Amino acid sequence: MSVDSTYRTGTRGTAGALVEEFAAAPDAGVREAYRRLVEAVWDGGTLTGLALPAAPEIVDGLDRADDDRAGLLAVLLGLLAEAEAYVPDSPVRAAVRRGMDRYLDRLDRCGSDEPLAQGLIYLLAHFPEDRDRILTQVSRLELPADDLSRLDRCLRELDPADPDLGRVWPAPSVWRLTDEEKAFDRAWIASLSPEQITVNWRNDTRNVWAYMGAKAYWTVRDGVPAAIPRVPHPADTGATVPPAAEAGPELLRPHAAAFRCPACHDRLDFGADDAGGVRCERCAVTYPVTRGILDLTEGISDAAAGTGDEASANLLRKLAEMPTMGLYYEALMRPEFLRVAGSNWDSAVTPASEDAYISSHVRPVDGPVLDLAAGAGRWTGVIAQAVGSERLVALDMGLPMLSTLRGKLPEVPAVRASALALPFEDASLGAVVCWNALQAFPDDAGTAIAEVGRCLRPGGTFTLMTFVWDTDPVYRHFQAAHSFPGRPAGMLLFEAEQLRTWLAEAGMVVREESGSGTFVFITAERAA
């Protein structure tokens, strides 16, 4: 029996039959029965015609189910409520909410470390109108601070007079900002229209739901996630970002032969004046170099002569914006991102295993080695150990990240430029690494890979780590529901075959491919 249009538009009896089929399935068949139930009522975030008659049946089924199956049903009820979270008078959401007494009663019989608790907390997070009641009940569980702060945030209503936007993922509790950072947030929030504030608030909420849902779904299927090794919080250690080391064009000059103007693709002149910028004669433009960062997005034309100092000062101001972002990312955000995007809740992939892969697979031929989308430099340091810092150039579009990188690795020059139009000559690079970054520009990933193929010398390696979609539609939804500043419509990952096709079209041959969960590690080589 298949889930077809009869099920999707059927009666409450049909819905009840599907719930009973799930309840009666042998342990080995639970996941398949759950898949059939999910597909009958929900399709990638959209409700089917069977959702309304099915909702009360699923609520009843949760009452009767053992803890393992009840956890799965709680996640499904959360998905049903979420699908119409902002639809006025949604009948499906109302039908799910009518089970509130039963959810709270079931939660009262759970321990905070039991998988069912995660499923119920995700479900309850969709009903801010019951905030006080839910939080009172949950207080007995003594949830970890991160879990509690996520639930608290989802149960809050937007206060248009004092909107608290951003800084909610992976949990509001991890964001402990300085006064300067709070002022920075207030300034950008004040520039938003009421409509933009509402959109941002809802996106923040969806991000937290997506994290909670991914964690709950993993937990009810596979058990309690492995603990992330905790590093001291930047706010507790008093850690500061070392200032990017002072350096001018001299740091980049050893690689001058490989560089090209991003506008006209002509050679760049790195000059003999270490205090100057980098010049394109054909475009009559000078690009500023400040603290070892060449900014190829901010050219100053000869017609604007005299503004070079102003451009450098502007770059310095940008470097000062949210200077601790790199620290937050490496210490607190990246491990959680790997959980969601890579299904790494079991910590199968560790920093040590990533280090080992890079060290053993980056095999450069002659020419500079590019760390593409280098971020805050955690893996730039690993590449430097593998190939030598004197060969390395780090490229990214994020100035706060590059500033952190330069503070940690003063011997490595940095370039602010686009991955979609690499500022390098054809066949000039010895190797390229793009680690945990290709998904940051998913719509243009094929273009970025083509650029890598253009710039690599024959025999040079392209080593990358990124993520593919989960084959389970529920977990795939939680991956996609994450929206970040560069991708407000939601996270976009890849299919493995898509990556292989792009690499082949760029003239590269895959030499190794591996990865647990939804990770993919690939090393390709530029063909002759």
Question: What spans do the regions from the language model cover?
Answer:
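N-terminal auxiliary segments of SAM/dcSAM-dependent transferases
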Residues: P160, V168-E321
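Conserved class I S-adenosyl-L-methionine
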Residues: T297-R363, T463-G490
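Class I SAM-dependent methyltransferase SAM/SAH-binding core
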Residues: P368-A421
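A short acidic, Gly/Pro-enriched loop at the edge of an enzyme's catalytic core
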Residues: L420-V432
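A short SAM/SAH-binding and catalytic strip from SAM-dependent methyltransferases
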Residues: G430-D444
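A short glycine-rich, Lys/Arg-flanked "PGG" loop and its adjoining helix->strand segment in the class I
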Residues: G446-P458
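Short alpha-helix
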Residues: G490-A506
